[in-house]
């Protein structure tokens, strides 16, 4: 479990970087399942994903000398490299280019996430850069946990369940840590 203080600190570092996305009532799903269903609109982030939260929170915690060497991830205003599979949708690539504002070099390699990740880790090691794991790092999870903080700040009446996608587990770990801590 991630300490709530780390999630709160990550939320502070994300001000002006990530937007606080709305929690939107979904009438169709609510009627279908006979309950109130809200969707957290992380697709409205400039890179169309919650992953910005974790990567940026991690970079904010890095010492300046490590940032100067660069990072291997999708970064904001620091020299960095982003490794993605060749199968990555063009829309995602274009959003990262736009958001990276010339600071991010995109390297398409491998057919799968695992292949791209292995290439990124090898590159980071070879060039003495910091590899920012997309989900398996405490600071990344804290950044992703800010989604849970925002959900709970909406002050909805009686939340019974929170569902989150599970890829690597960083989002659900961060959201779950925050909600469990305050409940």
Label every PLM stretch briefly.
Residues 1-183:
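PLP-dependent amino-acid enzyme catalytic core
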């Amino acid at each position: 479990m991630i300490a709530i203080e780390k999630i709160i600190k990550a939320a502070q570092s994300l001000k002006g970087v990530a937007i606080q996305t709305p929690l939107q009532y979904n009438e169709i799903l609510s009627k279908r399942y006979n309950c109130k269903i809200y969707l957290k609109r992380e697709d409205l982030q400039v890179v169309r994903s919650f992953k910005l939260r974790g990567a940026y929170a991690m970079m904010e915690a890095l010492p300046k000398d490590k940032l100067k060497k660069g990072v291997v991830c999708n970064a904001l205003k620091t020299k960095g490299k982003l490794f993605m599979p060749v199968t990555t949708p063009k829309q995602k690539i274009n959003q990262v280019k736009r958001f990276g504002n010339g600071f991010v070099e995109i390297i398409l390699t491998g057919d799968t996430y695992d292949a791209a990740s292995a290439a990124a880790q090898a590159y980071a090691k070879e060039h003495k850069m910091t590899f920012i794991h997309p989900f398996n790092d405490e600071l990344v999870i804290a950044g992703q946990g800010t989604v849970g903080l925002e959900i709970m700040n909406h002050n909805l009446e009686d939340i019974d369940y929170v569902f989150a996608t599970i890829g690597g587990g960083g989002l659900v770990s961060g959201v779950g840590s925050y909600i469990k801590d305050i409940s």
